[in-house]
Amino acid sequence: CGKSSAEAGLQDKLTGALIGLARTCQTAVPTAQTYRVILEGLFTTVTNVNFNTETTQVMIDKVHAESASLSDSPADDYDMSGLWNADEDIRSLKSLILFGMRGMAAYAYHALMLGKSSDELGAFFIKGLSALSEDWGMDELLPIVMETGKVNLTCMALLDEANTSTYGTPVPTTVPLTIEKGPFIVVTGHDLKDMERLLQQTEGKGINVYTHGEMLPSH
């Protein structure tokens, strides 16, 4: 929401680099590291996740390095102006695919942090990113849009399995709204593993930890 124009431009470059990596994977064999790089890269471009241009540039370099590790002739980065300046119907369909994958990558990344991954998801990220670079019409793009929704359900099931197998099945819980005296940390997002680590690190130190937004289920 509040990123600078410089950061917005870099996030487009990062997305273009990810599309190039996906296209490289069409002729090379992706690895578990490839999957992780794709997740990290897409997650970086989710709204309000990153505002730091240096961090984004590091991620771009990481994507390029992964492409180079897979092939002596990796695919070129995709120029995102080709998507943003396309016919409005094509732009809308490709945007649905892109934004759907960005959200899905966040969930898949959290699942991966808890030791859960899916070959089906990895294959779709490559397929979906590659589709963004194709000069396709509505008939070719609509099935990819529908598949994005279907695979998203698979991703949500994977995250649910990762969370419940690690922390148990959620039950209705009373959440206190009291603001305690003393230093505090507010945590948002979906990363329960980060919350667990933070609670361990602050235990007995007089630091209060509060949840915000999507972190409510941690209770």
Across the structure, where does each feature detected by a protein language model lie?
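Metallocofactor- and cofactor-centric catalytic cores in central/energy metabolism, strongly enriched
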Residues: 1-219
